[in-house]
């Protein structure tokens, strides 16, 4: 059922491909059209890889999943693609848990830990919106985290539950309500929230689970659909009249009645088998435990159609065989879809790691009678299962790993930047005088109003260096793992605006540290082999100075390691190619300028400085109570629910100014939590 097959991807931008972008776009598009299953875009820092991806999507016109390795990067990509494709369906699919404690059993202390979670209502809505977009239209881009490989409701069962309402159709009001209840919608006459409905005579209002703004009003007359309208649930203002509407289930785990009846019988059969096994092995406590828990769940499913933890019965509900791969987001995409894996050297290993951690926890639950063995099939995909199901793939990385290099049918380089900037010049200096040498380099950069990043190997070294630099009057900040996201963004903003001149850290490979103001990266103890001094890490760290026309990297080392040599050789190769390109085309390098991006929640457009400034202002403006609420996901969820109730109450009482103020407060706190 696709209602929007003809809408093309419409790339909206003032830029034209430049540098290596035109040839990279051409090669990738050609490779996709020729049937290459896997390709690699090897793009250096600051070469505009996201813009290249956007052009590939626009030229191939394929529904696309863009995978990132964490929520922060996914949110950043979502904002960028939303700006590139304002007329298409750009959606966001990440884990909807603000807080998640999975159920677990610790045999050594005989401790059972109940599942405890706080679900982010806004992200839940965005996930439902993402699957709706994939089912309804081809012009869909889904920006997802590794959450995409976790079990999701079966798409066939989900599609069976769709409710189509057409103007002029004959339908009984009670039948309509019954269908909504089967789709897990609840009646609520007091609070009209997402996933609820209300009845006023022959008028039925439904707030779709995937909608973030508008609700549906269905007016019946003598068992006939008289009119269908979209309206604003806050103000009651009508938006538009439509001839038909499709209402989607409230959850991905919704199940048709016949599937549920069949599942209940197969769960009973499995329970009997497990009881027999426990009794034969004289495990009477486990037998009692599994019988009590399972019978309670079955009763809930018979009475209400669902139960807490229903995902543990997903194998029965979907009718899959034992050990079969779970349905995931990838089951919702068409066969000719495109998958782009950003920062693939980090994202791909994550995909492989998810299954093992999940399995060991669940085995304890099964062995000690807390769950049936079929719960083991409620899991993320195994790596080999993921490999079998993925569509045409483009890996994107500045430093690809062995897997992507070996797997790719074509490796496309994007070394020349649109700005003409060349990779930083590299110098090697002795370790003995590294601290004093760094201090003199900082003073040189300070005179030119430029910034410095320094990376150390240990926390102790970073702390000592920060203290030493402060003694000499250097405006320095120390970025470490204990700093939360809001504070981190604030520090980065203050480095860019000159509050600090120097940033000291251990791992400078995280997002947000590509700043045009940084002209020097100093790598202390560069000859100590290890994760932070591997070839890939060195190349990426050196690249932190690549957005400045005077970019330079100093490696402090007493010997040349293999990793250092490879990183230097690769950087020199890129520099030669970039310099030659600039010479042939008469390009004068210019420092990078960060483009405008859309914020994920408010939809407003700010440039990078505005966003960071706005967040740091919010951070400073937070009261002690608000900081306490933001630090505890459970408190945050309760507080948001309270504010939403107050907003709807104010709206019902026609106090629209108060409702608008509460709405802005909700958006402000949501943005704060996301960042």
UniProtKB/Swiss-Prot annotation:
Q: What is its main location?
A: cytoplasm
> Can you list the GO cellular component terms from the UniProt entry?
cytoplasm; excinuclease repair complex
- Report whether Cytoplasm shows up as a keyword of the record: yes
Ranges of residues in domain Helicase ATP-binding:
30-417
Residues involved in ATP binding? 43-50
Per the Swiss-Prot or TrEMBL record, what residue ranges does the short sequence motif Beta-hairpin cover?
A: 96-119
Note the superkingdom of the native organism.
Bacteria
Residue span, Helicase C-terminal domain: 434-601
Entries under CDD domains matching the protein:
DEXHc_UvrB (cd17916), SF2_C_UvrB (cd18790)
Tell me the function of this protein. The UvrABC repair system catalyzes the recognition and processing of DNA lesions. A damage recognition complex composed of 2 UvrA and 2 UvrB subunits scans DNA for abnormalities. Upon binding of the UvrA(2)B(2) complex to a putative damaged site, the DNA wraps around one UvrB monomer. DNA wrap is dependent on ATP binding by UvrB and probably causes local melting of the DNA helix, facilitating insertion of UvrB beta-hairpin between the DNA strands. Then UvrB probes one DNA strand for the presence of a lesion.
Q: Which PANTHER family match?
A: UVRABC SYSTEM PROTEIN B (PTHR24029:SF0)
Outline the subunit composition. Forms a heterotetramer with UvrA during the search for lesions. Interacts with UvrC in an incision complex.
Q: What is this protein called?
A: UvrABC system protein B
Q: Which organism is it from?
A: Acinetobacter baylyi (strain ATCC 33305 / BD413 / ADP1)
Q: Which gene encodes it?
A: uvrB
